């Protein structure tokens, strides 16, 4: 058995017991770092210590020089097989072992081992010392040869547990390192995962923020769109309200205009009624006066019938010229004086009546104006509810074709009774009023005709008169058509020279025909005749529906439209229709804004005649009576009369102008 002491340093001490069953041999080996022999002793048998001490120097001197050749083959092979692995282990252990662990091993090896020596000494006997010495000699050589190998083996055996421990430690350290590395890797992985999670969370937060921003932007856009839509709806509502307000205002204006027109018409009707009443009164008075005059004239005519010659009848082909023939009478001066007195009385009575009528008219007009103002205030206070009805704009308006048929004025002849044989007409007798068919002009209307019992009226209608033309007159008319006369001012052509002369009076302003009652002048005699009917109260044109009478045929035509409902005059702007052209002209001023009536005192302009009259009466203290031809003293007498007279003369002219 080998006893292995704990190694302390590179110098190793080994003890080896070799012997047979009968003998024991103790061999101490010591290996130093420098290769010198150690103080170990070989004990075998009962030899003394001195022999051992003597042999030791020899062994020491001889042992290093001898090679280890005589070693057994088995031990050398084992040593050689174990050397490479042991060397590698030693090198690894030496590299891995720290220096503080090597120093105590070296110290343990250098310590003496007295315990082993004390155990070997009791076993030595005297008989065995020689054999032991021989064996020792033999074995010393072998021991010297095996000494380094044994040392190596001993070292290897000593180092194996340490190596195992160190390997275990290393393994543990490696495992710890691996565990640490694994933990670190896990920590790193966790950190990376955390970082990834943090990054993902940040990305998610960013995406959420972006989504929130997009949602906010979308909400803002939606809000803006809603606000814009609300604004558009509000604008549309405002526009609709404005349109409704404008339509309401327009309708209110139209209603006001219609009301004003109705009020004006009412005023005009009331004024016309008043005028008619006044005219009726005047006519009654005039009839009474005429009856008195007729009685006087009949008496005078009865006295003079015997003195007058029979009247001469004109030929058909010759034109009749009526002239006044002077008559000499003895009582002419007396008759003239009586006439003058009667005329003065009549004028005074007329003036008084006219003043009274003017006062009455002014009072009635003031009352009517007050009533109108009250009605307007009431209408303004009342709420006007308007109902809008859809109108088809694409509907075609019906075309109204008007066929104007000229109304032929009838010629009325008042035959003046004349004396039987004297040939002189009675002064003061009513003059004959002649109204010719269209195209004919009465040059002179005064003619001495035979006396009759009562004044007769001879009516010559237009178509019958024109159809009953003589061949000579028809020839003259044809020649006039072939040679028409043309006006040098406006270029208008006429078939007769008399028509041209009458037309030229409109350019020159001549008014040769004057009224004997009021002194008003006219350019045409027919206009004077129609004007004189105002004074005489004559109304030859009767309505076939209501038996109402009129002094002019145009007035009869206009009146008959109230029964038939005909409204031939249509407004081109709004389509409203009227039965009278003057109403259409007055209505069109609301569209055009025309103000034709100018105040001569202040220059203010007005749209309607009623407005300027009210203005003059309220501000300037002036007034005029309608239909009587009375004007202010500062204005000329023929300011408004000619236009009306000319309109009355040409019945179809206003209709043509309106169309």
Swiss-Prot record:
GO terms for biological process: regulation of transcription by RNA polymerase II. Keywords: Metal-binding, Repeat, Zinc, Zinc-finger. The keyword Acetylation does not apply. Residues 29-144, 638-659 are annotated as: Disordered. SUPFAM superfamilies: beta-beta-alpha zinc fingers (SSF57667). The lineage of its organism: Eukaryota, Metazoa, Chordata, Craniata, Vertebrata. The gene is ZNF853. GO terms for molecular function: DNA-binding transcription factor activity, RNA polymerase II-specific; RNA polymerase II cis-regulatory region sequence-specific DNA binding; zinc ion binding. It comes from the Eukaryota. Residues 135-144 have a biased composition (Basic and acidic residues). This is Zinc finger protein 853. It holds the Pfam family zf-C2H2. Residues 87-134 have a biased composition (Low complexity). A zinc finger (C2H2-type) spans 485-507, 513-535, 541-563, 569-591, 597-620. InterPro entries: Zinc_finger, Znf_C2H2_sf, Znf_C2H2_type. It comes from Homo sapiens (Human).
């Amino acid at each position: 058995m080998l006893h292995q002491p704990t190694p302390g340093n590179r110098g190793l001490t080994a003890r080896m017991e070799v012997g047979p069953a009968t003998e024991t041999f103790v061999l101490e080996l010591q290996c130093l770092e420098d290769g010198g022999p150690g103080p170990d002793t070989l004990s075998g048998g009962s030899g003394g210590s001195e022999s051992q001490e003597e042999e030791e120097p020899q062994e020491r001197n001889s042992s290093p020089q001898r090679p280890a050749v005589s070693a057994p083959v088995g031990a050398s092979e084992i040593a050689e097989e174990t050397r490479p692995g042991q060397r590698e282990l030693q090198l690894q252990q030496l590299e891995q072992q720290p220096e503080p662990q090597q120093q105590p091993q070296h110290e343990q090896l250098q310590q003496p081992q007295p315990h082993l020596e004390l155990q070997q000494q009791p076993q030595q006997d005297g008989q065995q010392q020689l054999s032991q010495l021989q064996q020792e000699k033999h074995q010393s050589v072998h021991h010297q040869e095996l000494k380094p190998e044994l040392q190596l083996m001993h070292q290897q055996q000593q180092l194996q547990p340490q190596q195992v421990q160190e390997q275990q430690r290393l393994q543990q350290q490696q495992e710890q390192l691996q565990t640490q590395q694994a933990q670190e890797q896990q920590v790193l992985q966790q950190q990376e995962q955390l970082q990834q999670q943090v990054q993902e969370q940040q990305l998610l937060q960013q995406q959420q923020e972006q989504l929130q921003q997009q949602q906010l932007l979308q909400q803002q856009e939606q809000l803006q769109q809603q606000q814009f839509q609300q604004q558009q709806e509000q604008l549309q509502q405002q526009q609709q309200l404005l349109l409704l307000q404008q339509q309401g205002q327009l309708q209110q204006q139209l209603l006001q205009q219609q009301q004003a027109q109705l009020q004006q018409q009412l005023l005009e009707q009331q004024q016309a009624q008043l005028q008619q009443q006044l005219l009726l009164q005047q006519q009654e008075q005039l009839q009474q006066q005429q009856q008195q005059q007729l009685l006087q004239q009949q008496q005078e005519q009865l006295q003079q019938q015997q003195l007058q010659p029979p009247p001469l009848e004109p030929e058909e082909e010759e034109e009749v010229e009526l002239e006044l023939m002077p008559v000499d009478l003895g009582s002419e001066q007396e008759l003239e004086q009586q006439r003058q007195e009667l005329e003065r009385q009549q004028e005074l009575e007329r003036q008084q009546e006219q003043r009274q009528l003017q006062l009455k008219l002014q009072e009635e007009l003031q009352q009517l104006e007050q009533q109108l103002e009250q009605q307007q205030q009431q209408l303004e206070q009342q709420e006007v509810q308007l109902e809008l009805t859809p109108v088809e704009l694409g509907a075609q308006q019906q075309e109204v074709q008007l066929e104007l048929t000229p109304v032929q004025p009838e010629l009325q002849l008042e035959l003046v009774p004349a004396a039987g044989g004297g040939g002189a007409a009675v002064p003061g007798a009513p003059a004959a009023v002649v109204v010719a068919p269209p195209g004919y002009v009465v040059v002179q209307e005064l003619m001495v005709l035979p006396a009759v019992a009562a004044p007769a009226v001879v009516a010559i209608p237009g178509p019958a008169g024109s159809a009953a033309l003589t061949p000579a007159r028809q020839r003259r008319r044809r020649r006039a058509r072939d040679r028409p006369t043309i006006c040098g001012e406006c270029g208008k052509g006429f078939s007769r020279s008399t028509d041209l002369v009458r037309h030229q009076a409109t350019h020159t302003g001549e008014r040769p025909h004057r009224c004997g009652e009021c002194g008003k002048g006219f350019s045409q005699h027919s206009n004077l005749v129609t004007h004189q009917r105002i004074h005489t109260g004559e109304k030859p044109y009767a309505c076939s529906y209501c038996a109402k009478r009129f002094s002019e045929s145009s007035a009869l035509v206009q009146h008959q439209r109230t029964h038939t409902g005909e409204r031939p005059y249509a407004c081109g702007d709004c389509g409203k229709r009227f039965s009278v052209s003057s109403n259409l002209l007055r209505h069109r001023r609301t569209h055009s804004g025309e103000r034709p009536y100018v105040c001569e005192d202040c220059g203010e302009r007005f749209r309607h005649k009623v407005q300027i009259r009210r203005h003059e009466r309220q501000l300037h203290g002036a007034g005029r009576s309608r239909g009587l031809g009375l004007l202010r003293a500062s204005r000329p007498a023929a300011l408004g009369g000619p236009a009306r007279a000319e309109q009355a003369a040409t019945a179809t002219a206003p209709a043509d102008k309106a169309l």
